[in-house]
Structures are given as structure tokens and as C-alpha cells.
């Protein structure tokens, strides 16, 4: 089994594409195993000490449909104690400036309450949003991607974030 489990939900393919880029940047499937949350169960989280959670913000500050179902039906069954968790999200900072990356913040708050330790915070500099549930202490709780308005920055942001995670996790 790989060292890292990456669990994501994707409706339009943008979050899935980011998940694949993150996996490649870490070194491929021998290091990071991808799990679509639509096909995952709570037991899939058991074999990993390090998790990456990816979710787009959907509608007006909501979880993506697959994450919404998992959040309501299975997330409470997982013991995140002893697990280190990083987050990334996709969203539209201009069209939804008042709730940019809210889904990432919703998941981070819930998983932290279940014992998960958050790593991988990301600066808010360079973004044009008004508010976000994913902001804590002047930073995002994870990597914020905007394929609608800043797609040209996605690759470099992922490279920088993965390097940061490797340093934080000493891998």
C-alpha cells in the first residue's frame, strides 16, 4: 500500500485533474493512492497515517455532491486520531467571492473535530476573494486552486504545495 491516501470528489473533472497532478508530483501511485469519494467507504481511510482531501466548492459554499453524501453518512465513523491531513480545493474566487473554498473549510473543521491534524496551509496572497470558511489565521487551511480564473497558476501552485508537504512530513 502507498504511504498516502488521497480522497477526492469531482463533478466537472477539475478536482480529479488536480488530484492526479498531486499524485504525479509526489512520485506516482507507489506513493499516493487515489480514491474517488463516491466509491470509498470509511474503512478505506484505515491504512493511511497521511491523508490528502480534495473537494470543490459547489453551488454557493456547499460540498460537492459525493462529499456531501459521505459527510452526512460515513465521515463520523472514521477515527482520524493519529492521522495527518492536508486539504486542497477548487473553486471560483471571482464568481463566488464570498464563499471561495468553503467546502475545504467545512471538511477541515469536521475532520479536525474527529482527531485529524491539519498540515499544508496556504497563503491567501494572490487571491481576490472576500470571505472563506477555509481561512484560519490569515491563511487557507490547504491549497486553494481556481481553474476558472487562475488556471495558469495551478501547476506551479501544486509543485510548491507538494514540496511544502514533503518538508512538513519529512518524506
Language-model segments: which ranges?
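A short beta-strand-loop structural module common to alpha/beta enzyme folds
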Residues: 29-41
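Short helix-loop-beta junction
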Residues: 19-30, 109-113
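N-terminal beta1-alpha1 ligand-phosphate binding loop
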Residues: 3-25
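FMN-binding flavodoxin-like domain, especially the glycine-rich phosphate-binding loop
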Residues: 3, 35, 47-171
Amino acid at each position: 500500500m502507498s504511504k498516502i491516501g488521497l480522497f477526492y470528489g469531482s463533478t466537472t473533472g477539475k478536482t480529479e485533474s488536480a488530484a492526479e497532478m498531486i499524485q504525479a508530483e509526489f512520485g506516482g501511485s507507489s506513493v499516493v493512492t487515489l480514491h474517488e469519494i463516491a466509491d470509498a467507504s470509511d474503512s478505506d481511510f484505515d491504512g493511511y497515517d497521511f491523508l490528502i482531501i480534495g473537494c470543490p466548492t459547489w453551488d454557493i459554499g456547499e460540498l460537492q455532491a459525493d462529499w456531501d453524501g459521505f459527510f452526512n453518512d460515513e465521515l463520523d465513523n472514521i477515527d482520524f486520531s493519529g492521522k495527518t491531513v492536508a486539504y486542497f480545493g477548487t473553486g471560483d474566487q471571482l464568481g463566488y467571492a464570498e464563499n471561495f473554498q468553503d467546502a475545504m473549510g467545512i471538511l477541515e473543521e469536521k475532520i479536525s473535530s474527529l482527531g485529524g491534524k491539519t498540515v499544508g496551509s496556504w497563503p491567501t496572497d494572490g487571491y481576490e476573494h472576500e470571505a472563506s470558511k477555509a481561512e484560519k489565521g490569515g491563511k487557507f487551511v490547504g491549497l486553494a486552486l481556481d481553474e476558472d480564473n487562475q488556471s495558469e497558476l495551478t501547476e506551479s501552485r501544486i509543485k510548491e504545495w507538494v514540496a511544502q508537504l514533503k518538508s512538513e512530513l519529512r518524506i
